[in-house]
Amino acid sequence: MSPFGQQLRELRRARKLTVNQLAVYSGISSATISKIENGKRGTPKPATIKKLAAVLKVPYENLMAAAGHIQAFPEEIREASEGYQSVYEIYQTAVTRGAEHLPIFNSQKWEHLSKQDIENLSKYFDFLSSEAKKRASSS
């Protein structure tokens, strides 16, 4: 399996999509998707990658870099974006739980929040997280 094929499979599974569902939503045949995932087909064309990125809800540039069509960001930029990686991981967790549609992931909703609003949200999140942890440990 190619690294791109492996990444494609992981993204598809994280979104709980079958090969056939990804095919229907992207307009790419299920045979082509299967061949890409299993490394039996070469690197997909940018147009194919664009369709996959849209359905999988990942940045087109990330898949283009994974496929080798564009160069990945230099190390300095990657190090500077560790905070963004954390946000991406939070979003990925939401995706695996089917919650990516919630307003908390809409950046426009954040524009009107004050510092105090965000601090209150953080406190409430800490409370919810603590309660969830208690429930998990008692089950």
UniProtKB/Swiss-Prot annotation:
GO molecular function: DNA binding; DNA-binding transcription factor activity
Pfam families reported for this sequence: HTH_31
PROSITE patterns the record matches: HTH_CROC1
Domain HTH cro/C1-type, first and last residues per copy: 8-63
Segments of the chain annotated as binding DNA: 19-38
GO biological process terms held by the UniProt record: regulation of DNA-templated transcription
CDD domains: HTH_XRE
Superkingdom: Bacteria
Key words of the record: DNA-binding, Transcription, Transcription regulation
Coiled coil: none
Name by which UniProt lists this protein: Uncharacterized HTH-type transcriptional regulator RghRB
Gene: rghRB
